[in-house]
């Protein structure tokens, strides 16, 4: 839906109370947490993300690069395309590459973050049913795309997707959850169901994964001189 009332939910970074709450939480629990939020920057609005390190420090922002538009997903009405470029955040536990939702459908995003030194990729997500086609269930397609990123880049991928139903007027979207963690071979290690809130975890040895990636040589054998054509289409 498109309604100007929702612009009132946007917050400013880093002055909102939200960041103080999660900063204290991360510091207390010795954990790293990416937080996505609706950002207001002067008269511009973004779908943004900040990573809070285990000491409570806030990273610089990432602003969602790819803004979709479709029935039930009217994001171009609310969000300006991001101006930060793809980001890799150095944390206590490793280098975290973060995209937001629709970013996950673009292999350029995953490859750029991996080349920039990411140890693991994370995509906070809100994807579900398609109002224009009630019979379409894109859950497997959605997972397959990110499993492909994991396998092609030899890097673990985490996708955190919401649950529940949102309805505005005659348009309804039911989000299908199914958050998952895939390993560097593209295999799903653990997955949530479609309806329940919760969390799952998996340990990775980033040093061993880096050695595995190097042993394959597909980053060594890249030909960036041949890829410039992509930017011309």
Task: State what each model feature region is.
Residues 1-15:
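A charged helix-plus-loop insertion that forms the helical arch/lid used to bind
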Residues 152, 160-233:
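C-terminal beta-strand edge segments of enzyme domains
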Residues 32, 120, 156:
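Short, Asp-centered acidic motifs that coordinate Mg2+ and/or phosphate
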Residues 36, 123-124, 160:
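Generic beta-sheet signal
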Residues 11-13, 20, 24, 40-148, ...:
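Active-site catalytic loop in hydrolytic enzyme cores
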Residues 141-148, 152-156, 162-163:
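Catalytic phosphate-donor-binding core of small-molecule kinases
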Residues 1, 50, 61-68, 180, ...:
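Short beta->alpha transition motifs characteristic of CBS
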Residues 28-29, 116, 153:
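Helix C-cap/helix->beta junction micro-motif
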